[in-house]
């Protein structure tokens, strides 16, 4: 049996606890802190069997002015447990002088050492402890506290902190030197708080201490309830009374397995977490990385990925890998239309927003004893993004995780093919398939469903298969962040205030990107309409208009927008499952019918429910090129073909009564021949780099993508494999690559 990397030591401790609170003096004699504490413990000992944390301490951490002391007292009263303020009850009693006097006496650096030493000589259990603002800057003392405590970070808006400190007439903070502002020091301190916390309480501006205390208790309950956030298959049938309950999966298991054993896709068993209006407003001034951490912490239980580790992953994923510091900026195009630029990552497509993070999540979740092979079907952008993302893992992880990207040999642009092939590394390979994307995607699903083959790989090679397409929850979840972030950027740029509705228009093939926008709405972003834009392969447009998903006599057309040249939209199943109130039986019937009869029809009530939120239309090839041309001539902005598809559809169906955010899913550099044709540039048989330099001479927006330009300069021709459109042939390639990598 596999043991997944989940922190089960977080389970609730319910046994009776008696606080033992003491400080070691210089003579190592133990003395009780105060008579008050001892009496409080005697008075409350009867209540301790019902303690929220048992013997563990609740440790409140945050900057000066966060309200740790006040909130700690409220929690102590609610739980009937001892309350310890490190400033008043530890430091001043140890030093026999005030904290300010000690700081004045020894200076900043020595103060931190003296403070840390005092905390190291202190122990307690079953108590609420309010730290000083500088405690987290001393590693040894924080490890000492963390051993028997749950550290809760009170994350208070910066302006609130500054206002409170003025009211408190605080004129100096530990570590503040002449010339350093309080604002700069508080920003500097954040790195230490992020390092230590187990749970974060994201405090709204103006929140009362009582509200914050309730949030702390809820955060601790969530932290300890390791079994509360699980995932089910979209084809999961809820058991009737008396029937055995099927076991759900944890986040880490859903990420590792990718596809459910019954052929369905993993979705949360409960509703998406929702942020309050005040919490969203507090994120308006945050960076993309800060927004990502807040949102993903709400969606990933700390037993699956501890908050501090998740923060490290996010900073690695969205650090120097992106050409724009805003990661996914929003640019005003014209009128009520805005462009969400999702192409600043290393491979120039929106896939980077997921696939720079997902490999780190995957590597954290897998057990150390097995090797893993990620199978990917790509219609253009996913392949290079997956190969690039997994190539950035550390050496140890790359030795146990490999990637195989299958792409239609003649179904992607020349640049995309060169990019996929050029992204091969020591743990990643590209395989061209003599068929279309739908065959590649269906073949991978069949490989996953073949228990004999997957079992053979596990037994013979100690290798397990998984996926990195948007069927994998770990791949889909990070996409929620940029849709939420786009809305917050419109607020920060002064175009809207929180609560104002927006529409989104997204070029759609596999339904993952637009589904992520649906999840952003569930978290509290007021998206009014989801506009689904298709190219000539408009099966989704037809479905949204009629409720009939029909693949009969429908052939895949190759277009200027190959990443949405898709007929089987995998993530549609997740949305139908959501609309149908998690009816797994219905999903099983519909998608089995699609597999056997190549079509299905949903009932009228579901069609009407779908059309309440969704609008759909499609764009011809001529309209796509015309949109690229007209947009450049009117605004100096070059759209890639996928974004042009969305622009055409948006112009046709949007009523202009609210702002419209168009997802720009790729950089135009990847489609230079189509762009040159659209801009009526004389066709020249030149290299890709020459074409990009020519486009660069137009000084258009956005500027050339430097990473893509560097890719075109690489003259070496990397080898890759090509195989026939046969599932068994794909299996043999997978086995051979496993032998080469792991044996």
From Swiss-Prot:
One of its GO terms (cellular component) is cytoplasm. It holds the Pfam family Thr_synth_N. CDD domains: SK (cd00464), Thr-synth_2 (cd01560). The modification N6-(pyridoxal phosphate)lysine is found at residue 351. It comes from the Eukaryota. The modification N6-acetyllysine is found at residue 281. Gene3D superfamilies: 3.40.50.1100, P-loop containing nucleotide triphosphate hydrolases, Threonine synthase, N-terminal domain. The keyword Acetylation applies. Keywords: Acetylation, Pyridoxal phosphate. Its cofactor is pyridoxal 5'-phosphate. InterPro entries: P-loop_NTPase, Shikimate/glucono_kinase, Shikimate_kinase/TSH1, Thr_synth_N, Thr_synth_N_sf, Thr_synthase-like, TrpB-like_PALP_sf. Belongs to the threonine synthase family. NCBIfam families: thrC. This is Threonine synthase-like 1. It comes from Pongo abelii (Sumatran orangutan).
């Amino acid at each position: 049996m596999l043991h997944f990397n989940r922190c089960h030591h977080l389970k609730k401790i319910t046994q009776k606890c008696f606080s033992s609170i003491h400080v070691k003096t210089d003579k190592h004699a133990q003395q009780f802190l105060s008579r008050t504490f001892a009496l409080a413990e005697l008075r409350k000992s009867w209540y301790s069997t019902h303690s929220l944390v048992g013997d563990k301490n609740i440790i409140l951490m945050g900057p000066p002015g966060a309200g740790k002391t006040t909130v700690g007292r409220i929690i102590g009263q609610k739980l009937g447990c001892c309350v310890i303020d490190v400033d008043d009850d530890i430091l001043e009693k140890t030093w026999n002088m005030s904290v300010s006097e000690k700081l004045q006496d020894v200076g900043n650096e020595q103060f931190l050492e003296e403070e840390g030493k005092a905390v190291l000589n202190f122990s307690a259990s079953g108590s609420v402890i309010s730290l000083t603002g500088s405690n987290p800057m001393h590693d040894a003392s924080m490890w000492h506290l963390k051993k028997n405590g749950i550290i809760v970070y009170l994350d208070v808006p910066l302006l609130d902190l500054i206002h409170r400190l003025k009211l408190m007439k605080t004129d100096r903070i530990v570590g503040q030197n002449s010339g350093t502002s309080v604002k700069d020091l508080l920003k500097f301190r954040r790195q230490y708080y992020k390092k230590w916390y187990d749970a974060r309480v994201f405090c709204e501006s103006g929140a009362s201490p009582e509200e914050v205390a309730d949030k702390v208790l809820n955060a601790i309950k969530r932290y300890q309830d390791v079994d509360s956030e699980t995932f089910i298959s979209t084809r999961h049938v809820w058991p009737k009374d008396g029937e055995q309950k099927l076991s759900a999966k944890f986040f880490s298991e859903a990420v590792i397995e990718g596809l459910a054993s019954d052929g369905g896709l993993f979705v949360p068993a409960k509703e998406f977490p929702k942020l309050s209006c005040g919490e969203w407003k507090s994120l308006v001034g945050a960076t993309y990385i800060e927004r990502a951490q807040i949102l993903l912490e709400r969606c990933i239980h700390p037993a699956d990925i501890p908050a501090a580790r998740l923060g490290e992953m996010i900073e690695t994923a969205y650090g120097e890998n992106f050409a724009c510091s805003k990661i996914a900026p929003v640019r005003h195009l014209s009128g009520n239309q805005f462009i969400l630029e999702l192409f600043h990552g290393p491979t120039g497509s929106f896939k980077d927003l997921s696939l720079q993070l997902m490999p780190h999540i995957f590597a954290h979740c897998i057990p150390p004893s097995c090797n893993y092979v990620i199978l990917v079907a790509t219609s253009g952008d996913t392949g290079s993004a997956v190969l690039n993302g997994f190539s950035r893992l550390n050496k140890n992880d790359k030795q146990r995780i490999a990637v195989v990207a299958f792409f239609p040999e003649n179904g992607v642009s020349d640049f995309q093919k060169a990019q996929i092939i050029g992204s091969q590394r020591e743990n990643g390979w590209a395989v061209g398939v003599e068929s279309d994307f739908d065959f590649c995607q269906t073949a991978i699903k069949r490989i996953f469903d073949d228990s004999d083959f997957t079992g053979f790989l596990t037994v013979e090679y100690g290798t397990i298969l998984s996926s990195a397409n948007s069927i994998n929850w770990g791949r889909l979840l990070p996409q929620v962040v940029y849709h939420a972030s786009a809305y917050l950027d419109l607020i920060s740029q002064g175009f809207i205030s929180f609560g104002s509705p927006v529409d989104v228009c997204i070029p759609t093939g596999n339904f993952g990107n637009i589904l992520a926008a649906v999840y952003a709405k569930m978290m509290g972003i007021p998206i009014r309409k989801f506009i689904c834009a298709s190219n000539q392969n408009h099966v989704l447009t037809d479905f949204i208009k009629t409720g009939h998903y029909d693949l009969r006599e429908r052939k895949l057309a190759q277009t200027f927008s190959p990443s949405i040249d898709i007929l089987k939209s995998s993530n549609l199943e997740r949305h139908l499952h959501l609309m149908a109130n998690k009816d797994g039986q219905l999903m099983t019937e519909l998608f089995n019918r699609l597999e056997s009869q190549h079509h299905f029809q949903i009932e009228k009530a579901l069609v009407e429910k779908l059309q309440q939120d969704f609008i759909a239309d499609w764009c011809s090839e001529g309209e796509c090129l015309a949109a690229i041309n007209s947009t450049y001539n009117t605004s100096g902005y070059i759209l890639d073909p996928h974004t042009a598809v969305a622009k055409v559809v948006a112009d046709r169906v949007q009523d202009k009564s609210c702002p419209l955010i168009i997802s720009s899913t790729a950089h135009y550099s990847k489609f230079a021949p189509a762009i040159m044709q659209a801009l009526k540039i004389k066709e020249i048989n030149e290299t890709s780099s020459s074409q990009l330099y020519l486009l660069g001479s137009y000084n258009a927006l956005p500027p050339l993508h430097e990473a893509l330009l560097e890719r075109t300069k690489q003259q070496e021709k990397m080898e890759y494999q090509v195989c026939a459109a046969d599932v068994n042939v794909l299996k043999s390639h997978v086995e051979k690559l496993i032998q080469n990598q792991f044996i």
